[in-house]
Amino acid sequence: MGGLVVLLVGLLTALMSVVSYYVSPKGNNTSTWQMSLILTFSCCYLLWAITYLAQLHPLEAPSRVLE
């Protein structure tokens, strides 16, 4: 289930990037807007995916301290 969620959110991010490419404001700064939006979506996805996967498969297993 964990890997599927990451892929589905990745597809959603790709879809949002494509939509933002065509919906970005037209004018002198069109390419700046397009790249800014696409990079924002990509960086947010990477931050989320790394955090999600780190919690899904932690490097150290939790241990119980006996008193």
From Swiss-Prot:
Keywords: Hydrogen ion transport, Ion transport, Membrane, Transmembrane, Transmembrane helix, Transport, Vacuole. GO terms for molecular function: ATP hydrolysis activity; proton-transporting ATPase activity, rotational mechanism. The chain crosses the membrane at residues 3-23, 36-56. It comes from the Eukaryota. One of its GO terms (cellular component) is fungal-type vacuole membrane. One of its GO terms (biological process) is transmembrane transport. InterPro entries: ATPase_V0-cplx_e1/e2_su. Residues 1-2, 57-67 are lumenal. Residues 24-35 are cytoplasmic. It is a multi-pass membrane protein. It is found in: Vacuole membrane. Its main location: membrane. V-ATPase is a heteromultimeric enzyme composed of a peripheral catalytic V1 complex (components A to H) attached to an integral membrane V0 proton pore complex (components: a, c, c', c'', d, e, f and VOA1). Belongs to the V-ATPase e1/e2 subunit family. Subunit of the V0 complex of vacuolar(H+)-ATPase (V-ATPase), a multisubunit enzyme composed of a peripheral complex (V1) that hydrolyzes ATP and a membrane integral complex (V0) that translocates protons. V-ATPase is responsible for acidifying and maintaining the pH of intracellular compartments. This is V-type proton ATPase subunit e. The lineage of its organism: Eukaryota, Fungi, Dikarya, Ascomycota, Taphrinomycotina. The gene is vma9.
